[in-house]
Structure formats: structure tokens, C-alpha cells
Amino acid sequence: MIWKRHLTLDELNATSQNTLVAHLGIVYTHLGDDVLEAEMPVDARTHQPFGLLHGGASAALAETLGSMAGYLMTRDGQCVVGTELNATHHRAVSQGKVRGVCLPLHLGRQNQSWEITLFDEQGRRCCTCRLGTAVMG
């Protein structure tokens, strides 16, 4: 297991209360040895005007996952902040849920890179993101 902080899924989800994460309905669903996953509904909260998943909502899910994964890689007195987010949208989604899977690309002392892939309910890749974070403290 790569994580330096050991939180349960319930503890991770509790951090989202009264935030954008809760408003968008994002829920952490799996914490593995080197992976963090979450789901987000595709509904009125996350649609763009034409009834499809908004790219900004996809980016918010990606940054949520990457930032929390980055936090799990810090020690007491440290935190992470996002420095760069890139998203490539592959497929439109209009309903259901999307699942985000976050894996590390680089874990340095001062910066990290995370790959976050979003899948629709049929398991098809709909978005690929990369998040860079800086370790503070």
C-alpha cells in the first residue's frame, strides 16, 4: 500500500460535507493499494445545457480524486494543492453515473502527478485527466 495516511471510505466521504464535492454528489467508493475511486451522478447537477455531462463536472471529479489521493500521500503538517489539470473528453454521457479511477504517475517529495480516468456505466472510457499537485508544508 502506497498511502501514508490511513483513512476509511467513511472518513474520506465525511471530508466532503458542505463542499462542491457533496453538491455534485461525488462519493468515494474504493481505496486500494495504489488506487482511489469515486462515482458521480450524471443528472441536472452535472449536466451542461444540452443534457450531457458537463466537462467542468468531469474536471471537478478528476481534481477531487487526484487531490484526495495526493493528500493521502502526505504526512502530518502537509497538504497538496493542484497546479495543473488536463482533461480529454472521449465520449458523451447523458445519464447514470460516471466512475473515476485515480492512479499515481509520479510521487515526488515536492510534486505529484495523477492519472484519473472516467468510465460510464458500461465501462467505456469517457474522459482521461492528468492532475499535477504540489506538496505544501
Swiss-Prot record:
**Record flagged with keyword Transcription regulation:** no
Tagged with keyword rRNA-binding = no
Location comes to:
Cytoplasm
Swiss-Prot/TrEMBL GO biological process terms: enterobactin biosynthetic process
Q: Which family does it belong to?
A: Belongs to the thioesterase PaaI family.
What interactions and quaternary structure are annotated? Homotetramer. Dimer of dimers. Interacts specifically with the aryl carrier protein (ArCP) domain of EntB.
Q: In its UniProt entry, what is this protein called? A: Proofreading thioesterase EntH
Q: Which organism is it from?
A: Salmonella paratyphi A (strain AKU_12601)
Report the gene name.
entH
